[in-house]
């Protein structure tokens, strides 16, 4: 993934899942001894500075649709792994962007879909899929979503009114990729195909 590295960057290979890597990063952030000697930051959506700028393209998409008269009743489908992208969209919504509904597209790692159905959040180990950037069993941004919508004491009701969820199998994702290619000649990545 890295073609050149600065002197302050070291790439490490971890024998584990995204959740394992995320746990290591969070542990490093909490390590007082390590933090006395190094200044640490994360390049993924644990860091709000990573996903907050993503809220701008929701505004941009709305503006483009508004120009052609199609902005009313806007529904946005978002591939959902660690929930940084959809959290950025929810921030945009809180800032006043009139998005009617969000769809959290999940692969087999569907802890958020389960939460929408039951009101109970149950993290679990992730399983590998062809949409591997979404292979997250405990999305760190779920806590931010709860914080955004938990002020009335019933975050599940408020979240469920704004966000729907769907789960797609590897077979469905592959079929969508094939269909889009056959119809348009465009090679769709598995994460985009997860939002059909």
Predicted regions and their residues:
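PLP-dependent amino-acid enzyme catalytic core
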Residues: 1-196
């Amino acid at each position: 993934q890295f073609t050149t590295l600065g002197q302050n960057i070291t790439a490490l290979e971890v024998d584990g899942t995204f959740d394992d890597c995320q746990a290591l990063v969070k542990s490093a952030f909490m390590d007082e001894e390590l933090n006395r000697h190094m200044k640490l930051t994360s390049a993924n959506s644990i860091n709000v500075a990573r996903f907050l700028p993503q809220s701008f393209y929701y505004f941009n998409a709305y503006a483009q649709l508004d120009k052609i008269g199609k902005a009313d009743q806007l529904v946005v489908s978002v591939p959902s792994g660690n929930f940084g992208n959809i959290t950025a969209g929810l921030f945009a919504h809180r800032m006043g962007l009139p998005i009617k509904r969000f769809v959290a597209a999940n692969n087999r790692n569907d802890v958020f879909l389960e939460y929408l159905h039951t009101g109970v959040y149950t993290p679990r180990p992730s399983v590998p899929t062809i949409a591997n950037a979404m292979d997250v069993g405990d999305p760190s941004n779920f806590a931010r979503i709860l914080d955004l919508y938990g002020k009335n004491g019933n975050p599940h009701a408020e979240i469920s009114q704004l966000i729907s969820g769907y789960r797609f199998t590897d077979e469905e994702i592959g079929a969508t990729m094939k269909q889009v290619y056959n119809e348009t000649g465009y090679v769709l990545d598995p994460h985009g195909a997860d939002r059909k």
